[in-house]
């Protein structure tokens, strides 16, 4: 089947949605950027700039709208809303879609209430659409400014994944296509939780050695869970797995790292900045347990977030686990 994507819609006009609209515009596509809030849409359309990305002008080929039906007419649609709001956004969009329209989830997480991955949510909320997932090491500000970035885009059909990559790729944004949808989703969800752990380590001033150990052992957990779901090794060690983990464990530009940093310092969580890992942690632990997978770092994060254990007690418990061979 031939896929041609000249028009791209982005549903969600936050920083990441606007950055991805810029990506599609640089790739030569005609872009519709949908904002649910009318005032926000007017501000962006009038200033030709998103206040969440100051100093970065919108390309002329980006049209800002509050008309969801207009967005639904695009050849492919990027859904750029938080993971816990994905179902609602897709349900509103579903009746307006042509059969087979690709819906690309651009959130990293697991639906808290159902334990469903992002493409599973899309499949349930819009059965006539074709789900896909975009993930990888990418901060909105870097992407919006046109700094070199590489990500993974996965869909069940390789031809579709390849066509979407061709539609979005440019000299500054390099997507790799894959059919390992679940592997990509697991990498994105797990790294959010591990980034909170990395932030806690940094907030506690436990040192670079501890951060390196945490990141490495956390990655081992990500790999174990991925293998239990049949993920490919090249996905887990690729951009959407190891690559994204490295980025989000590296500094406070990551919302999940920033949340962990605040926890480690004994400060309130950052206001107005959603850290998906807060929702994902308990779900990830339950999914791991259902597959017989040990994830002690993720368990520690979930316990800290729920208030059932202190940070110091969680760290001590991790360090006092039985000694064993590295795997």
Curated annotation (Swiss-Prot):
Keywords: Cytoplasm, Lipid biosynthesis, Lipid metabolism, NAD, NADP, Nucleotide-binding, Oxidoreductase, Phospholipid biosynthesis, Phospholipid metabolism. GO terms for molecular function: glycerol-3-phosphate dehydrogenase [NAD(P)+] activity; NAD binding. SUPFAM superfamilies: 6-phosphogluconate dehydrogenase C-terminal domain-like, NAD(P)-binding Rossmann-fold domains. Pathway: Membrane lipid metabolism; glycerophospholipid metabolism. One of its GO terms (cellular component) is cytosol. InterPro entries: 6-PGluconate_DH-like_C_sf, 6PGD_dom2, G3P_DH_NAD-dep, G3P_DH_NAD-dep_C, G3P_DH_NAD-dep_N, NAD(P)-bd_dom_sf. It holds the Pfam family NAD_Gly3P_dh_C. It catalyses: sn-glycerol 3-phosphate + NAD(+) = dihydroxyacetone phosphate + NADH + H(+); sn-glycerol 3-phosphate + NADP(+) = dihydroxyacetone phosphate + NADPH + H(+). Sn-glycerol 3-phosphate binds at residues 108, 136, 138, 191, 244, 254-256. The keyword Translocase does not apply. PANTHER family: GLYCEROL-3-PHOSPHATE DEHYDROGENASE, GLYCEROL-3-PHOSPHATE DEHYDROGENASE [NAD(+)] 2, CHLOROPLASTIC. Belongs to the NAD-dependent glycerol-3-phosphate dehydrogenase family. Catalyzes the reduction of the glycolytic intermediate dihydroxyacetone phosphate (DHAP) to sn-glycerol 3-phosphate (G3P), the key precursor for phospholipid synthesis. This is Glycerol-3-phosphate dehydrogenase [NAD(P)+]. It comes from Bradyrhizobium sp. (strain ORS 278).
């Amino acid at each position: 089947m031939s896929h041609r994507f000249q028009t791209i819609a982005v549903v969600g006009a936050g920083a990441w949605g606007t950055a991805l609209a810029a990506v599609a515009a640089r790739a030569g596509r005609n872009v519709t950027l949908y904002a649910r809030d009318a005032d926000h849409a007017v501000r962006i359309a009038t200033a030709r700039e998103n206040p969440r990305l100051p100093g970065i002008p919108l390309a002329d080929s980006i049209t800002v709208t509050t008309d969801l039906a207009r967005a639904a007419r695009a050849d492919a649609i990027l859904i750029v809303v938080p993971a816990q709001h994905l179902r609602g956004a897709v349900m509103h969009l579903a009746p307006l879609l042509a059969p087979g329209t690709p819906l690309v989830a651009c959130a990293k997480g697991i639906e808290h209430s159902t334990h469903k991955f992002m493409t599973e949510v899309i499949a349930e909320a819009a059965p006539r659409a074709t789900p896909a997932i975009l993930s990888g090491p990418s901060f909105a500000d870097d992407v919006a400014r046109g700094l070199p970035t590489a990500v993974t885009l996965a869909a069940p059909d390789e031809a579709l994944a390849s066509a979407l990559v061709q539609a979005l790729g440019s000299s500054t944004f390099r997507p790799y296509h894959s059919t390992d949808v679940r592997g990509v989703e697991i990498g994105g969800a797990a790294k959010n939780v591990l980034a909170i752990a990395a932030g806690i380590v940094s907030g506690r001033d436990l040192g670079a050695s501890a951060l390196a150990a945490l990141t490495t052992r956390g990655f081992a957990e990500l790999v174990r869970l991925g293998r239990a779901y049949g993920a490919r090794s090249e996905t887990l060690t690729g951009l959407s797995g190891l690559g994204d983990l490295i980025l989000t464990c590296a500094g406070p530009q990551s919302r999940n790292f920033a949340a962990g940093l605040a926890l480690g310092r004994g400060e309130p969580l950052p206001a107005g900045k959603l850290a998906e890992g807060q929702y994902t942690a308990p779900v990830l632990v339950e999914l791991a347990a259902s597959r017989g997978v040990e994830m002690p770092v993720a368990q520690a994060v979930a316990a800290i977030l729920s208030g059932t254990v202190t940070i110091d007690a969680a760290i001590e418990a991790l360090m006092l686990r039985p000694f064993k061979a590295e795997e």
